[in-house]
From Swiss-Prot:
Protein name (Swiss-Prot/TrEMBL): Ribosome-recycling factor
Compartments in which it is found: Cytoplasm
InterPro entries documented for this protein: Ribosome_recyc_fac, Ribosome_recyc_fac_dom, RRF_sf
UniProt record similarity statement: Belongs to the RRF family.
Length: 182
């Protein structure tokens, strides 16, 4: 039972790391880079994807079609204020974001950012492992389980931890390849 909870929590950490990776801009248009952009809309911070249809008509363009044309100014301002690093082009109907090709230096910076995100994911997994091992030791101390059972569980916990750490390494390798592909 405990290992299932452990796997579930570690899987959530892997998924959170994947979502973080999705916000990193590569050389290709990807609407998910706008996931963290919020727009002040009638006094409320609202996620951009709730205010507009976001599409990628080609590999270097993101097109934003607001449901309410009156919000175009706020959307444009929100994109400029965000960390996306793109300049919006507003033609009155849609807002276009042209994705410039990444420089070698920018690619290296993005790889460092991805590595940092991966490390944060691994830290979260190690924290889950630490909590699980603490629980096992507490059970052993309270004589709920034997020393051998405790060692076996701790070994199982470490194996699960290694599996999920490897998953994050695989995601990182794929993201690095994606970033460095010209």
């Amino acid at each position: 039972m405990m290992l299932d909870d452990l796997k579930e929590n570690m899987q959530k950490s892997v998924e959170a790391t994947q979502r973080s990776f999705n916000t990193i801009r590569t050389g290709r248009a990807n609407a998910s880079i706008l996931d963290r952009v919020t727009v002040e809309y009638y006094g409320t911070e609202t996620p951009l994807y709730q205010l507009a249809n976001i599409s990628t008509p080609d590999a270097t363009t993101i097109m934003i079609q607001p449901y309410d044309k009156g919000s175009m100014g706020q959307i444009e301002k929100a994109i400029q204020m965000s960390d996306v690093g793109l300049t919006p082009n507003n033609d009155g109907q849609v807002i276009r974001l042209n994705i410039p090709p990444l420089t070698e230096e920018r690619r290296k910076d993005l790889v460092k950012l991805a590595s940092k995100m991966a490390e944060e994911g691994k830290v979260a997994i190690r924290n889950i492992r630490r909590d699980a091992i603490d629980d096992v030791r507490k059970q052993e101390k309270n004589s709920d389980i034997s020393e051998d059972e405790s060692r076996g569980l701790q070994d199982d916990i470490q194996k699960v931890t290694d599996q999920f750490t490897d998953k994050i390494d695989e995601l990182l390798a794929a993201k690095e390849k994606d970033i460095m592909t010209v």
